[in-house]
UniProtKB/Swiss-Prot annotation:
Catalytic activity: (3R)-hydroxybutanoate dimer + H2O = 2 (R)-3-hydroxybutanoate + H(+)
InterPro entries linked to this entry: OHBut_olig_hydro_put
Pathway linked to the protein: Lipid metabolism; butanoate metabolism
Leader sequence segment: 1-23
Organism of origin: Ralstonia pickettii (Burkholderia pickettii)
The protein's name: D-(-)-3-hydroxybutyrate oligomer hydrolase
């Protein structure tokens, strides 16, 4: 509990992209997926735990409101809350819910303001179900105030944005920091929340988390954490700037948001050998940004303290105790979802300067060390595997999930019928993958039906809960495993775009599925419409060594002689975990630099996750992390809320028929977690104990579920029933996490 002012206080896709993809028999989207450091980040430039400008340990030493040393040129934008605003970019709650995206006057040359509006529109809708039946406008949304009351307003928030690059001196860091400060910021009760981008998204990738802070009159500290949607188009050598507009790499210089490290002479040869390729920030920066996600989140908080005081008119000459907003009197909550949630936890673990007071995250990506001694039990039965790093289990799913989704036991799964109709995929591709796995000795069954059942059981045995079974088809259909495995494989290995890791690359394709020139309109707007982890808007995953020439990976013919969705590429990515070649060793080193310690330094913390999560299975994230934290954090204040009938992609609920009748929005619980941590820090209200929250699906026909009500999404409680309690015990160096059925 924090003393405030001297008093004792009493979420990898976008909806429009997916709709367009299905209409065109293509596949595009991913909403969000899985922080750490290499042991050096916490001391990098002295910035990870407080840089000496504004930390709470100076105790009155004369310190001006000096911009942190790592912050470069700052751009300040002001929004009146009428024509434009912080939360909805002037669209209001109704505009965010509209199926019609904001217009762009010149499609091939959008302005920075147009791109910002389009970015906020797409990123909000990617992580939130914006349908009224799903709860938008009643349970959550810009027009629902901080106390949960439905208002008649449109939820627009006036205020200022401060934007900057942090600079480590290399000119290649490729990270953006942004602070939103509402005009209603409560300087008498100051608060900051972090909203590190989810997935591989750009700076507004966690705008739906920022919404909670803006409603609470808090500042919101964002960072893109070294990821983003705007690519380096190698054919034209053009790159995105900080605001998403594009120019040549030469003109951009060090102001580029991302430019692949390369020599012009080598680029020319590369373009001849592999034309029309694209480099992406997360995959191809060669910096393994994930190892510094905690650092970047902490830097965003430091930047926020300076920006708030600057907005309040404080310049120089004040002591720390005279600054109106300072760590000693400000509640700081590290928050976000998915990869951003993992970054928030990384920041809390690395927070040597006590900048962060509490943590509230949803479905965090948590890569855990293999040395943890944690046993997870469900209903009294021990689970065979838990606590694997993200790249491990995603590369495993990349082999088996496509085949597993063909199992007759999950024939009713959302999107499974699309495979049967060959919508965007080759006919019989699932059966071909099953047969190819058998030919490689990875499945023992001899019939397609038995192979699919065997693959599904392998998924369960490797940590996926049975509650995820009905999600495997949509995960496979939207190529989530190959996209995540390819991007993270490149990033962890610090691979150059020139390396074509596992003979995979990114490009637009023509009608014959071969690499083609990028559409000018799509490229100009990609920073706003993409998700940073191809396949994404107009960009596909390419198998460079397909029979007949480079081709879209899912359409390609590989060494099996069939269209098996490039099993060769999947096997190559998987083998990086155990291989001894240079690329494998680079990836293994990079992965070791991203692992979590489990020590939250006694900070009050809430993790919420859906039991059905098929992207980041609970057995590889929140559950074992709860045990690891109990082992290493002697003053642990962590609680874990596991929500039944909830999964990773709220944005799919109104998009894919069947999701609406099966799943409730996890966003409701992410906001409740923030409410609970804030109440704990502000008023001393205890956090709820770890528990399973049992929700009720909306039911009804797929695509026509009845409207959600509060009864569908009960709150967590301070006194959960014995059959709902999640228990953690540590004995003999082993932590046991017991989860009820």
């Amino acid at each position: 509990m924090k003393t405030i002012q001297g008093k004792s206080p009493g979420r990898w896709y976008s909806r429009g992209m997916l709709l367009a993809a299905m209409a065109a028999s293509g596949v595009i989207g991913l909403a969000a997926c899985g922080g750490g450091n290499d042991g050096n980040s916490a001391g990098n430039n002295g910035n990870a735990g407080g840089n000496g400008n504004n930390n709470g340990n100076n105790n009155g030493n004369t310190v001006s409101n000096t911009k942190p040393s790592f912050v470069g040129t700052v751009t300040v934008r002001r929004f009146d809350g009428v024509s434009d605003d912080l939360l909805t970019a002037g669209l209001g709650a109704s505009g965010l819910a509209s199926a019609t995206a904001p217009a762009v006057a010149n499609a091939v040359a959008p302005t920075a303001a147009e791109l910002r509006r389009l970015t906020i529109y797409n990123n909000y809708r990617a992580l939130i179900d914006t349908s009224a039946k799903g709860g938008y406008g009643t349970l959550y949304g810009p027009n629902v105030d901080a106390d949960g009351n439905v208002t008649s307003g449109n939820g627009m928030v006036a205020g200022a944005e401060y934007v900057a690059y942090p600079d480590d001196g290399s000119g290649q860091q490729n990270v953006v920091l942004l602070v939103q400060i509402p005009d209603a910021f409560d300087a008498a009760h100051p608060c900051i929340i972090t909203a590190t981008s989810s997935g591989s998204r750009g700076i507004y990738g966690a705008i739906s988390t920022g919404e909670w802070g803006l409603k609470r009159k808090c500042a919101v500290a964002y960072t893109d954490k070294g990821t983003g949607a705007g690519p380096h188009d190698l054919a034209t050598d053009t790159v995105p700037l900080q605001d998403g507009t594009r120019t040549t790499r030469t003109l951009a210089g060090n102001t580029a948001q991302f430019a692949a490290p390369l020599a012009a002479s080598r680029l020319a040869a590369f373009n001849v050998a592999t034309p029309n390729r694209l480099a992406f920030k997360h995959a191809h920066s060669q910096r393994n940004p994930e190892k510094d996600w905690g650092l970047f989140t902490l830097q965003a908080v430091q930047f926020a303290f300076w920006a708030i005081n600057d907005k309040l008119g404080i310049s120089s000459g004040q002591t720390v105790s005279q600054l109106p907003v300072r760590p000693g009197n400000t509640i700081v909550i590290a928050s976000s979802v998915s990869n951003g949630g993992g970054a928030a936890i990384a920041a809390a673990e690395q927070d040597t300067g006590n900048l962060i007071d509490g943590v509230a995250v949803g479905e965090p990506a948590l890569s855990l060390p293999s040395s943890i001694n944690v046993q997870v039990k469900r209903g009294g039965a021990s689970l065979p595997i838990n606590g694997k790093p993200l790249f491990d289990y995603v590369s495993y799913a990349n082999e088996f999930r496509l085949c597993a989704a063909l199992s007759a036991s999950v024939a009713s799964a959302p999107t499974q019928a699309y495979f049967g109709a060959a919508l965007g995929w080759p006919a019989s591709v699932q059966a071909n993958r099953c047969a190819a796995l058998h030919a490689k000795g990875l499945l023992s069954s001899t019939t397609t039906a038995a192979q699919a059942d065997e693959a599904l059981q392998k998924m369960r045995d490797y940590g996926w809960e049975p509650e995820s079974d009905l999600l495997h088809a949509s995960m496979a259909y939207f190529e989530i495993d190959p996209s995540v495995a390819t991007t993270f494989g490149n990033a962890l290995a610090r691979a150059s775009v020139f390396d074509n890791l596992c003979d995979l690359s990114f490009a637009a394709v023509d009608g014959s599925f071969h690499p083609a020139t990028m559409n000018a309109t799509v490229l100009a707007q990609l920073a706003a419409t993409g998700n940073g982890v191809p396949p994404t808007t107009g960009v596909q995953l390419i198998n460079n060594i397909a029979q007949g020439g480079a081709a879209q990976s899912r359409q390609s013919i590989d060494s099996s002689g069939t269209q098996a969705a490039n099993l060769d590429g999947a096997l190559c990515l998987r083998n990086l975990l155990s291989g001894s070649d240079a690329a494998s060793q680079a990836l293994q080193l990079g992965l070791s630099q991203t692992l979590r310690s489990g020590n939250l330094r006694g900070k009050p913390a809430l993790i919420v996750q859906g039991r059905n999560d098929a992207l980041l299975p609970v057995n590889h994230g929140a559950r074992p992390y709860l045990g690891l934290n109990a082992q290493v954090d002697g003053s642990s204040k962590l609680s874990y809320i596991e929500v039944t009938n909830a999964q990773h992609f709220d944005g799919f609920i109104d998009l894919l028929p069947g999701y609406d009748s099966l799943f409730v929005p996890l966003a409701v619980y992410e906001q409740r977690a923030l409410d609970a941590v804030y109440a704990n820090l502000r008023s001393g209200t205890p956090l709820p104990p770890s528990q399973v929250v049992r929700t009720t699906p909306r039911g009804g026909a797929a695509g026509a579920a009845p409207p959600i009500t509060a009864a569908n999404v009960p709150n967590f409680t301070m006194t959960p029933a014995a059959g709902d309690r999640i228990q953690v015990s540590v004995s003999g160096g082993v932590a046991t996490v017991s989860v009820p059925n």
